[in-house]
Structure formats: C-alpha cells, structure tokens
Regions:
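Intrinsic, low-complexity polybasic segments
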Residues: 1-3, 9-28, 33-36, 40, ...
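An N-terminal boundary/leader segment
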Residues: 79, 89-170, 405, 466, ...
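Structural helix-boundary/capping segments
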Residues: 101, 127, 153, 231, ...
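Serine-dependent amide/ester hydrolase catalytic core
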Residues: 127-131, 418, 437-526, 568, ...
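Short helix-loop capping/hinge segments that flank enzyme active sites or metal/cofactor-binding pockets
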Residues: 189-211, 366, 371-381, 428-482, ...
Length: 605
C-alpha cells in the first residue's frame, strides 16, 4: 500500500499548502481530501492552487480536527475527531478512493465562524485536553492559537480578560510542544492554556489588581504560583478581570465582566474574570483568590467549580494583598478533578512566604474512585431551612441525596451561629486592607473608588480594643467549627441563599442582601477552612444553582474526592451557556489575535 503523509498547518494569515510527499497519487489525494472535508465539515471554499496544493479561502482561526484519516480502495474513515465522530459523514466520507493512507494529524482551517468551530474543544475538560496533548494528538501551539482566537471572538463582550499576553502564551506553547516532542513530561498541565486573576505578579507584566493607579505597576519577578505553573508546563494566556483591589466594586478604566448565562445578572466578585473565562471556554482553568467569598461567589454566579483551599495551603508571595489573614489562593475550573490538578501544582511550602503551610500536599487524583463509603457528611437542617429560596433549597437537598446514594453517611450537625462572623468580617478585613494600602492611601485617596475607600476608612478608624474583641470572637468561632469536624468529615451547604442576583439588585445593595451574599462564605474565611463549590441545578431564570462542601483544615483531598464522585454521576458541571455571537469581533481581528505576531492587549473601557 502506498503512503502519503499530509500536513496542513495553520500558521499565519494564510493556510499552508496541502503537500503530499508522494507525487504520483498527489492529484487524486488532494481531490479526495477536498471532497471529503467539504462534506465532513462543510468548509465553504477550498481553493486548489496547483495540482498538488489547495488552500482554504477566507481563512478564519483554526478548527482543531486533529484527525487520522484512512483512505482505502473502497472506504474513507475519519478515525478520530477529537476523540469522537460527530456525523456519519465523518466516519464514511468517501467511497471507492485510491489506496492511500494518511496518518498525520491534520489541523484544518476554514471560513466558518470561529465561535461555532471552537465550541467543542473549548469545553473539553482540562484533563481531556491534557490527555490529547500528551498523546500528541493535539498541538499546544494549535490549541493556544485557537484559544486566543476564541478570546478575540468573544471577550470583547464578556470582558473576562484585563490583558491577553498572546506573545508569551505562544512562546510557552512552542516550548511545551518541543518538550513533548522530545519525550519530556511535566505533568497534566503541560501545554494546557490557563489564565490568572490580575493579582499575581508575572514578570514584565503589570499587576493592576483592578486598580487604575496600578495600571503601570510592572512586576519584576513571578509570583510563586506563577513560577509553579511554569514549572508544570502550563501556557499562560493572560490576566483576568477583577474588582478594584479584590474588594467589591468593578471600576474604570477596566471593563466589568459579563455573566455568560445572562448579562443582566451579577458575575460575582472579586474573581469575576476567572469564573467568566472558565464558564465561557476562554481557558481551561484559572487562578483566583478569596478573602470573603471571591472564589465561591463568582463560581456560583457562573456555574463552574471552585476550590478555596485552607488558608496557607498556597503561597501568597508576590500576590496583591487585600487582607493577609483572610486571603486564600485557589482555583476555578470546569470540574473538581480539573481544579485539583492545578491546586496540586501550586500548593505547598514556600521559603518566600513564611505563612505558607508545610503540611504535605497530597496526590489529589489518587483515590478518585467515586465511592464515598465511610465518609461522614454533615447536614445542619436549620441552615438548609432558613434564608434559602425554594429552588436553592431543593437543589441542595437533591445534591445531598446524591452524595448519600454514593455511600456517604449523613450526620446531623449543629454549626455555630454565623451572624457575628458575617458582620465581624468587615472590620477585620478593613484593618488589614488599610495596612496593605498605607503607601497609597490616604495620599492618593481621590484615585480610589467609594467601596474600597470606605473599607479602608473603617479600618483606619477601628480602635485596638475593638479589634481585639473581634479577634477573640473569631477564635471562638474557629474552635466551635473545629468541633463539628470531630463528628463529620464534610459539611454540605448552599452558597447563594437566593440565587444569582441581578445587576440592578446589586446596584441597590442593602444589609439584607449583604447578609445573604456572605452568610455561607465569610464565616468560613474567618475560620480558614477549605471549600469546594459545585453546580447542582438550573433555576427557572436559566441561571446555575450550586452548593458547597466544607471540611476541616487541610482536608482538600476529601473534598475533591466527594466532589468528583458527585460530578461523576451528574452533568450540571457540563452545562454551558449560549455564547453571545452578536457581539463577536470580525474574523480579521480574530486572526490578528491568533497569529504569531500578536502582542498583549490591554482592554479598558
């Protein structure tokens, strides 16, 4: 049997030629592939430029088919299409063709809309993409270019990114591709495109923390978590949008992220860009941080999975500070297993951060069996019955029932009263925020937004005696919560008491809404315990419903195990919104962003 190896790369503004290496069958092969692919992917225009070459017309950003195509005398089979065949035409595209076998992965481009073209691979899980990359069925460079194209296509509306670092992302991808080709395996993040909240220093890139006064605060070294992502081979796409100073309010000059499910609804705070990017398929995972709910609330609002680890589990070296004893570094991803891969890469002791714990970092993927026998699942019926709307209560109860079916033993627990902790969180945070901003506040007070300025003023006005009273109450709460984990391994709770609020409702925030938003988040930041947030339903308004599980200090492995077991039997985490194509940019602009000559894009209002 004669063989022809076909390559169809995608670099630059034009497609490279289809160039068989065996000349005798080249004309028939090119004709065969042309017909096959027009039927299989409905490419509108394939332009033959010579007897042995043809190109796509009006090239748009790449669709990664990564197919192995077998052309035999009586049959053509598309054996692999990102792991699955999508139509009969893909399996049996042609009949009675010449005896040629094409075994090289193909990357096809055509002039269909990139949003639709990229939809499938954009929503693969991180671990699925990792497997494709490590088997060399996907190219890190192709994947990164395609993801950059998707960002360019959609993020003009969603505003998930403050800065897209396209050039360095492509350099990361090329390095990963070369290493994988040489047999170097850095682990499951090798070659995978991720993004980070704009509080983590990346050398040579500004760390704005969502603040106009920091627009030119270029970092001179990487944060520890960035260095660890690089060591794991991850491809960093850019910096993600957030509220001013990681507090409550999105502020100019940076655009406010939009909730992909419905932009009339709140995207969460402060790690809004992290959750929006993952939800919209603009990265496979994102670093985030939480001081009072900033991982769990955006994850809840956007229907994605978030892990807030134990305080100190992850180094905060070169991470912009809101409140030192409350700040947690965590992860947003599509699944608990995906998030755990990232957490494992970034966690651990750090000589540059004395507050980073020396507790050993477990292999989170070990023991993801789906069996929860022996796990004691704590349930406080009073918490499930009070302050919740009906949809949230039903979805949370259904999630608990599913965990029970998986083998978890339900244990009745009584959680300590959280009313003090909800309101104590604000002055405790305020004092530490005032300290973090002492070099720029009050000297540049007029450049601060009203929410962050008010928090700092509260901290500056607090007396030492008042602060000590708050710290004692915090210590008592932590002790009472620790006692709960003597009876239960995990406790299941809601996240948002009344579902995702609208933007209009958030613009008229009052004490009742503040309490509802923070009831299930702030107290556990005060305690420093870990939590995982999981989608568990869809409300009548089409917005996601979520629940969370909390555990004792350094119990992330147990939480990941339970979360993975739940997601193995449900599909809520696989639901995704319809992307707002009406707001997409033109294909020419998408190509410029996807091309190798891209430069970083600073998006502002």
């Amino acid at each position: 049997m004669r063989q022809a190896i076909v390559r169809w790369p995608h670099v630059g503004r034009r497609a490279s030629p289809l160039a068989p290496r065996t000349g005798r069958d080249a004309p028939r092969l090119s004709q065969s592939l042309r017909g096959a692919r027009q039927r299989a992917i409905q490419s509108p225009r394939l332009l033959q430029s010579s007897p042995i070459e043809f190109r796509c017309g009006a090239i748009a950003p790449p669709l990664l088919l990564n197919s192995t195509v077998e052309l035999r005398e009586d049959d053509v089979r598309v054996a692999t299409l990102l792991g699955r065949s999508t139509s009969r035409a893909d399996k049996y595209a042609l009949r009675r063709q010449p005896s040629v076998v094409v075994r090289e992965p193909l990357a096809f481009l055509c002039d269909r809309e990139p949003t639709a073209m990229h939809e499938h691979f954009a929503y693969l899980s991180l671990l699925e993409v990792s497997s494709q990359l490590r088997q060399r069925r996907l190219s890190p460079v192709e994947l990164t270019q395609a993801m950059l194209a998707r960002i360019a296509q959609l993020d003009g509306h969603l505003n998930a990114y403050i800065r897209v670092t396209a050039e360095s992302a492509l350099a990361d991808a090329r390095r990963a591709e070369q290493e994988i080709a040489r047999g170097i395996d850095r682990g499951p993040l090798h070659g995978v495109p991720v993004a980070v909240k704009d509080i983590f220093d990346i050398k040579g890139v500004p760390t704005t923390a969502g603040m106009g006064i920091r627009a030119h605060a270029v970092a001179d070294e990487d944060a520890t978590v960035i260095r660890r992502l690089r060591d794991a081979g991850a491809v960093m796409l850019g910096k993600l949008s957030m509220t001013e100073g990681a507090y409550a309010e999105h502020r100019a000059p940076f655009a406010t992220p939009r909730n992909p499910w419905d932009d009339a609804y709140w995207p969460g705070a402060s790690s809004s860009g992290s959750a929006v990017a993952v939800c919209a398929g603009l990265c496979y995972a994102a670093l985030a941080s939480e001081t009072g709910g900033s991982i769990r609330l955006p994850a809840a609002a956007n229907g994605v999975t978030g892990i807030k680890p134990t305080w100190g589990r992850v180094s905060r070296h070169r991470t912009f500070e809101l409140a030192a004893t409350l700040d947690h570094v965590g992860v947003v991803a599509r699944s608990a297993a995906d998030a755990a891969v990232v957490l494992e890469a970034i966690a651990g002791a750090d000589p540059d951060d004395p507050t980073a714990s020396r507790s050993p970092v477990p292999d989170f993927s070990n023991g993801l069996t789906g069996d929860l026998k022996g796990v004691r699942l704590g349930v406080d019926e009073a918490w499930l019955g009070a302050h919740l709307d009906d949809a949230t209560a039903r979805a949370t109860s259904a999630a608990i029932a599913a965990l029970r079916e998986l083998g978890a033993e339900l244990v009745a627990v009584t959680l300590p009263d959280v009313n003090d902790m909800i309101w104590d969180w604000f002055p405790v945070c305020a004092v530490q925020t005032a300290l973090a901003h002492e070099s720029t506040y009050p000297s540049r007070r007029n450049e601060y937004g009203p929410s962050l300025a008010a928090l700092i003023e509260q901290g500056r006005a607090l007396s030492g005696m008042e602060l000590q009273r708050l710290l004692l109450r915090r210590r008592v709460f932590r002790g009472k919560l620790a006692a709960v984990f003597g009876a239960a391994d995990i406790v299941a709770l809601p996240v948002l008491a009344g579902g995702v609020p609208t933007i209009e409702r958030m613009s008229n925030i009052d004490d009742e809404l503040i309490a509802d938003l923070h009831r299930f988040t702030c107290p556990f930041n005060m305690a420093g315990v870990p939590s995982v947030v999981l989608p568990c339903g869809i409300a009548k308004n089409g917005l996601p419903l979520v629940f969370q599980m909390i555990g004792a200090h350094f119990s992330e492995a147990s939480l990941v195990c339970a979360a993975h077991a739940y997601q193995a039997i449900t599909e809520w985490h696989m639901r995704r919104p319809t992307m707002p194509r009406a707001h997409a940019i033109e294909p020419d602009q998408a190509r410029r962003v996807a091309g190798a000559s891209c430069s970083g894009i600073l998006r502002s209002q």
